[in-house]
Amino acid sequence: MSERGNRKTQVGVVVSDKMDKTAVVKVDRLVKHPVYNKYIKRSAKYKAHDMDNAAKIGDRVIIVETRPLSKDKRWKIRQIIESKA
């Protein structure tokens, strides 16, 4: 499989797998507050395409940016790093 260009990748945790071929992945990041110089945890949820329905709740996964697959899906699950079960 050849990649076209450098695509964004994120590491996150699956928080929902109830949809068919879709998983919701929560990605955490640290942001430095501009005034207080304290690091604050920020999170975002992404709907990611999971062709084989392999990802389960609690799994750590790598997601990669892709073309729009539906109204909300712009990410695919590339690899399951760590399985919860």
Curated annotation (Swiss-Prot):
Q: Which GO terms describe its biological process?
A: translation
Q: Does the keyword rRNA-binding apply?
A: yes
GO CC annotation terms, alphabetical: cytosolic small ribosomal subunit
Does Iron show up as a keyword for this record?
no
Question: Which CDD domains does this chain map to?
Answer: Ribosomal_uS17
What are the protein's UniProt keywords? Ribonucleoprotein, Ribosomal protein, RNA-binding, rRNA-binding
Which Pfam family is one of those matched by this entry? Answer: Ribosomal_S17
Entry coiled-coil feature ranges: none
Question: Single GO molecular-function term?
Answer: structural constituent of ribosome
Q: What transmembrane ranges does the database entry give?
A: none
Extract the PANTHER family matched here. 40S RIBOSOMAL PROTEIN S11 FAMILY MEMBER, SMALL RIBOSOMAL SUBUNIT PROTEIN US17M
**Family listed:** Belongs to the universal ribosomal protein uS17 family.
**Record text on subunit structure and interactions:** Part of the 30S ribosomal subunit.
Q: Which NCBIfam families would you find in this protein's record?
A: PRK05610.1 (NF004123), uS17_bact (TIGR03635)
Q: What does this protein do?
A: One of the primary rRNA binding proteins, it binds specifically to the 5'-end of 16S ribosomal RNA.
What is the name of this protein?
Small ribosomal subunit protein uS17
